[in-house]
Amino acid sequence: MNLHEYQAKALFAEYGLPVSEGFACDTAQEAVEAAGHIGGDMWVVKCQVHAGGRGKAGGVKVTGDKEEIRAFAEHWLGKNLVTYQTDEKGQPVAKILVESCTDIANELYLGAVVDRATRRVVFMASTEGGVEIETVAEETPELIHKAIIDPLTGPQPYQARDLGFKLGLNPTQMKQFTKVFMGLAKMFEDHDFALLEINPLVITDEGNIHCLDGKIGIDGNALFRQPKIRDMHDPSQDDAREAHAAKFELNYVALDGNVGCMVNGAGLAMGTMDIVNLHGGKPANFLDVGGGATKERVAEAFKIILSDSNVKAVLVNIFGGIVRCDMIAEGIIGAVKEVGVEVPVVVRLEGTNANLGRDVLASSGLDIIAAESLTDAAVKVVAAAEGK
């Protein structure tokens, strides 16, 4: 689960971090009034969506004219913003963030992630703020400095000072940076973050550290113990199919291909997508029905896959460990009959009751293409998607 920038900054403020005064507005009139309340003669207005690249897409504007704020809000509210991180439909804009304008002398980067390699929370800092950190990591990795947080001792001020020294901060800025670092580390642990970014973390003309942006991703598995964070969820930013799948405990991610995939197990699902790609196809989705799949969940998975008009063929790849292949076969048959599937369906069953599952499919009278191996399944589904 992701938070909007205005929500992230509200959390920053709760932990004593320096942020700009700002208001998230639902209407153009509110945006104009917010600028008046903030005061000053320059403001920044930003579309609130769960995607980066807003500035290049026209979703951020710096202005000293309140009528331009009104025009910006009227233009974007209720529309979709398309950036390089969204699909072609973009993300809906329901709020506009109006903030005071901050003078910038230098831009830095500060972020944290749960790193699987070290099994620790790792903070990253760089002098290359204001640009995509992935680009910095690829082109100039030596400019990214790290601090690994020991879960037993927690974050330490010396780690902040070490990062600050590498960023070239002066003693006053070092104290401010240490406060920001310690606050973010506590926030990360308190609220079960999976990702945190301030890009850019700026040094103002007065020489002060300031959080100019905020990006937060929450570990979805921890939401049951984070009611405050859970209430911040904006369902309008979710893919409708992904949100629907979650209700049935299906792990679904929409992609842009034409081969629908239904698999049990995340690893097998990724392997299935890889082999479809290897044989010239493009997966339309990632869908893991899980080890405890039922006939109802399989039927619902079919409905979700087929709700994508780009899907030209469906590959069902099931390895029966916990789940029984004959039960999956019955679910497939029920789904095909209920939904009225009009695209080719390729099925590969292995494991518990696999032979029985194949017999169930063979005796169903439905036009289902059986596959003997994963390679055979990939070849057949790619050919079917191409109409061969």
From Swiss-Prot:
It catalyses: succinate + ATP + CoA = succinyl-CoA + ADP + phosphate; GTP + succinate + CoA = succinyl-CoA + GDP + phosphate. Keywords: ATP-binding, Ligase, Magnesium, Metal-binding, Nucleotide-binding, Tricarboxylic acid cycle. Pathway: Carbohydrate metabolism; tricarboxylic acid cycle; succinate from succinyl-CoA (ligase route): step 1/1. Binds 1 Mg(2+) ion per subunit. GO terms for cellular component: cytosol; succinate-CoA ligase complex. Pfam families: ATP-grasp_2 (PF08442), Ligase_CoA (PF00549). Residues 9-244 form the ATP-grasp domain. It comes from the Bacteria. Its cofactor is Mg(2+). PROSITE patterns: ATP_GRASP (PS50975), SUCCINYL_COA_LIG_3 (PS01217). One of its GO terms (biological process) is succinyl-CoA metabolic process. Mg(2+) binds at N199, D213. Substrate binds at N264, G321, I322, V323. InterPro entries: ATP-grasp, ATP-grasp_succ-CoA_synth-type, ATP_grasp_subdomain_1, Succ-CoA_synthase_bsu_CS, SUCC_ACL_C, Succ_CoA_ligase-like_bsu, Succinyl-CoA_synth-like. ATP binds at K46, G53, R54, G55, E99, T102, E107. GO terms for molecular function: ATP binding; magnesium ion binding; succinate-CoA ligase (ADP-forming) activity; succinate-CoA ligase (GDP-forming) activity. Its EC number is 6.2.1.5. PANTHER family: SUCCINATE--COA LIGASE [GDP-FORMING] SUBUNIT BETA, MITOCHONDRIAL, SUCCINYL-COA SYNTHETASE BETA CHAIN. Heterotetramer of two alpha and two beta subunits. NCBIfam families: PRK00696.1 (NF001913), sucCoAbeta (TIGR01016). Succinyl-CoA synthetase functions in the citric acid cycle (TCA), coupling the hydrolysis of succinyl-CoA to the synthesis of either ATP or GTP and thus represents the only step of substrate-level phosphorylation in the TCA. The beta subunit provides nucleotide specificity of the enzyme and binds the substrate succinate, while the binding sites for coenzyme A and phosphate are found in the alpha subunit. HAMAP family: Succ_CoA_beta. Belongs to the succinate/malate CoA ligase beta subunit family. This is Succinate--CoA ligase [ADP-forming] subunit beta. It comes from Shewanella halifaxensis (strain HAW-EB4).
